[in-house]
């Protein structure tokens, strides 16, 4: 499923980027 970038930022404060 696709998660909003903001949500990912919240989960990964280090700035992890997931390729979509």
From Swiss-Prot:
GO cellular component, one term: extracellular region
Main localization of the protein described in the UniProt heading: secreted
Cellular compartment(s): Secreted
One example of a Gene Ontology biological process annotation: innate immune response
Keywords: Immunity, Innate immunity, Secreted
Domain of life, source organism: Eukaryota
Its biological purpose: Involved in the recognition of invading microorganisms causing their aggregation. Activates the phenoloxidase cascade. Binds specifically to beta-1,3-glucan. Binds the A.niger cell wall component alpha-1,3-glucan, a fungal pathogen-associated molecular pattern (PAMP) that activates the host immune response.
Family to which the UniProt record says this protein belongs: Belongs to the insect beta-1,3-glucan binding protein family.
The protein's assembly and partners: Monomer.
Protein's name according to its UniProt entry: Beta-1,3-glucan-binding protein 2
């Amino acid at each position: 499923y696709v998660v909003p970038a903001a949500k990912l930022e919240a989960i990964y404060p280090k700035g992890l980027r997931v390729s979509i």
